[in-house]
Swiss-Prot record:
Pfam family, one: GTP_EFTU_D2
Key words, A-Z: Cell membrane, GTP-binding, Hydrolase, Membrane, Nucleotide-binding, Protein biosynthesis
Function: Required for accurate and efficient protein synthesis under certain stress conditions. May act as a fidelity factor of the translation reaction, by catalyzing a one-codon backward translocation of tRNAs on improperly translocated ribosomes. Back-translocation proceeds from a post-translocation (POST) complex to a pre-translocation (PRE) complex, thus giving elongation factor G a second chance to translocate the tRNAs correctly. Binds to ribosomes in a GTP-dependent manner.
GO BP term, example: positive regulation of translation
Taxonomic path: Bacteria, Bacillati, Bacillota, Bacilli, Lactobacillales
Record's catalysed reaction(s): GTP + H2O = GDP + phosphate + H(+)
Protein name: Elongation factor 4
MF-aspect GO terms: GTP binding; GTPase activity; ribosome binding; translation elongation factor activity
InterPro entries: EF-4, EFG_III/V, EFG_V-like, EFTu-like_2, LepA_C_sf, LepA_CTD, LepA_IV, P-loop_NTPase
Membrane topology: Peripheral membrane protein
Gene giving rise to this polypeptide: lepA
EC number assigned by the record: 3.6.5.n1
SUPFAM superfamilies for this protein: EF-G C-terminal domain-like, P-loop containing nucleoside triphosphate hydrolases
UniProt family annotation: Belongs to the TRAFAC class translation factor GTPase superfamily. Classic translation factor GTPase family. LepA subfamily.
Length: 611
């Protein structure tokens, strides 16, 4: 392909993402677009075709961004190359959305006609505006009886500031109106403008590990071209490789002769060292490198930390290898080794939220055949010590002795809760109960309010989202961002089983709620931990002060069953022998703690009962 042909091809490229609040129909719209561009045969077509992880299909959510190249024959008679990137909708995966948008010129914003504009809809609009993208509003599910397309258009105008007349009414399920969306993409999304003759400059927006090909880089080529046999350089580490293959996903990988400025595709170069590749890095030519790298991505800060431990300590190295491979595919995951007296060796992992943590644990167990125990999640605390130094504490077990602590600061979030007027009362009540500070209330329309509170992150990760949904019958939507650290009256609560501290069950709580939480946790653990042949006391303590206690009763074997009822001496002797045996067993007996016990520190009673 000569330069003129490349320039002509570039004019026909359209790079766009589909973004929306969770459950508004992104993946269904992606399915229809694939169908209408004949990218996939009727035989291969299935729902959520781009959600290729079994976990995504089971949960019905998108977890990973997914890029696919399509050819669309437009009404003007020309063929256009669409690079479509499907993105997640859950707040935990907003990092995936921001990476997708950096590889695009346009964003199709899907809004559910039955739900209207929700918190994550707004968050995605701001991400798209940050990346200077053309936003195409689409109103989905207009075929449902409860759909209100006119009301939704008004929200799009009032709350987002987009022209409601530009919004396209569609039903992604039936395909109605989708052809109009495709035509708008051709007309309104600008073609990429990268210089084809400049040195290669490509942004790595995702990557994964393949056992046969090594690391597969997903790239958006910004300038120049790359083909098989070229020498490339990863600018972050300076490592050089020879390109083994370039291609596009359509949706299966298809090798191509060349990737040029504007293309979204993949590069393989027999990269075996996972540490060499980083999402956000710039790929350039080793022989003719570019002067300065692309801006890349801001480093994500984990919001939630938890310990991951293999049930078999011999699998520690397998867990490390698995985490390294997952980190390649999920740049927001962080981990470092740690050890626990109760659980042995494992890793302290950082996640963006509880769903992110759940998904990582499930992927590790499924994809890498590991059996894991996860400790209760916690946040990062800033501890000011009496000697003037500050320590960051991610693990409650590492909290310094209370006598050496001057102050403890905890992270707060600015929570934006969109809710119908009728439910403002229950929402404010919930926020107050969760130690929230009221900020402001914005009336978005006659029927909807945006309530803004500053709430400790530790309260958000506990059970806030479930309580919010139940107190508003599912109508509220939540978006939040970190809002700095504030001093709080916090204490570390230790859990003792049979008199021994279990470091992995320690947690941090506000002093005002410490006794209540201690009683809750000990009661939950009593339900979960199996009975033994000896009585097990469960205690919650702040330092040396016990604030709550309960006992798990011992199994009682009837040792007197075989003796004659009229022999009281023999009976007393056997009972005394049993008592002495249990006392000895209690002194040396180790209590087996099931996985559910570690999550009991987090879950509410209702959630435990459901299990």
């Amino acid at each position: 392909m000569n330069l003129e042909e490349m320039k002509e091809r570039q004019k026909h490229i359209r790079n766009f993402s589909i973004v929306a609040h969770i459950d508004h129909g992104k993946s269904t719209l992606a399915d229809r677009i694939l169908e209408m561009t004949d990218s996939i045969s009727k035989r291969e077509m299935k729902n959520q075709i781009l959600d290729d992880m079994p976990l995504e299909r089971e949960r019905g959510i998108t977890i990973k961004l997914n890029a696919v190249a399509l050819t669309y024959h437009a009404k003007d008679g020309e063929d256009y190359i669409f690079h479509l990137i499907d993105t997640p909708g859950h707040v935990d995966f907003s990092y995936e959305v921001s990476r997708s948008l950096a590889a695009c010129e346009g964003a199709v914003l899907v809004v559910d006609a039955t739900q209207g504009v929700e918190a994550q809809t707004l968050a995605n609009v701001f991400l798209a505006l940050d990346n200077d993208l053309e936003i195409l509003p689409v109103i989905n599910k207009i075929d449902l009886p409860s759909a209100d397309p006119e009301g939704t258009k008004k929200q799009i105008e009032d709350e987002i500031g987009l022209d409601p007349d530009e919004a396209v009414d569609i039903s992604a399920k039936t395909g109605m109106g989708v052809d109009e969306v495709l035509e708008k993409i051709v007309k309104d999304v600008p073609a990429p403008t990268g210089d084809l003759t400049a040195p290669l400059k490509a942004l790595i927006f995702d990557s994964k590990y393949d056992d046969y090909r090594g690391v597969v880089l997903s790239v958006r080529v910004v300038e120049g071209t790359v083909k098989k046999g070229d020498r490339i350089k990863l600018m972050n580490g300076g490592t050089e490789y020879e390109v083994a293959e370039v291609g596009i996903n359509s949706p299966k990988p298809l090798a191509r002769d060349v990737l040029m400025a504007g293309d979204v595709g993949y590069i393989t170069a027999a990269i075996k060292d996972i540490k060499d590749t980083r999402v956000g890095d710039t790929v350039t030519s080793a022989d003719n490198p570019t002067d300065k790298p692309l801006e890349g991505y801001r480093q994500m800060t984990p919001m939630v930390y938890a310990g991951l431990y293999p049930t078999d300590n011999a699998k520690f190295n397998d867990l490390r290898d698995a985490l390294e491979k997952l980190q390649l595919n999920d740049a927001a995951l962080t981990f470092e080794p740690e050890s626990s007296q109760a659980l042995g060796f494992g890793f302290r992992c950082g996640f963006l939220g509880l769903l992110h943590m759940d998904v990582i644990q499930e992927r590790l167990e499924r994809e890498f055949n590991l059996d894991l125990i996860t400790t209760a999640p916690s946040v990062t605390y800033h501890v000011e010590l009496a000697d003037g130094t500050t320590k960051e504490v991610e693990n409650p077990a590492e909290m310094p002795d209370a006598s050496s602590i001057k102050a403890i600061k905890e992270p707060y979030v600015r929570a934006s809760i969109m809710v119908p007027n009728d439910y403002v009362g229950p929402v404010m009540e919930l926020c107050q109960r969760k130690r929230g500070d009221f900020d402001t209330m914005e009336y978005l329309s006659d029927t909807r309010v945006n309530v803004i509170y500053h709430i400790p992150l530790s309260e958000i990760i506990f059970d806030f989202f479930d309580k919010l949904k139940s107190s508003t019958r599912g109508y509220a939507s939540l978006d939040y961002e970190i809002d700095g650290y504030r001093p709080s009256n916090l204490v570390k609560i230790d859990i003792l089983l049979n008199g021994d501290k279990v470091d992995a069950l320690s947690f941090i709580a506000h002093r005002d709620f410490a006794a209540e939480r201690g009683r809750e946790i000990t009661a939950k653990l009593k339900k979960i931990i199996p009975r033994q042949n000896f009585e097990i006391p469960i205690q919650a303590a702040i330092g040396s002060k016990i604030i709550a206690r309960t006992n798990i009763k011992a199994y009682r074997k009837d040792v007197t069953a075989r003796i004659h009822t009229g022999d009281p001496d023999r009976r007393a002797k056997l009972l005394d022998k049993q008592k002495r045996g249990k006392k000895r067993m209690k002194a040396v007996g180790k209590v087996d703690i099931p996985q559910a016990a570690f999550m009991a520190v987090l879950k509410t009673d209702e959630q435990l009962d459901e299990k």
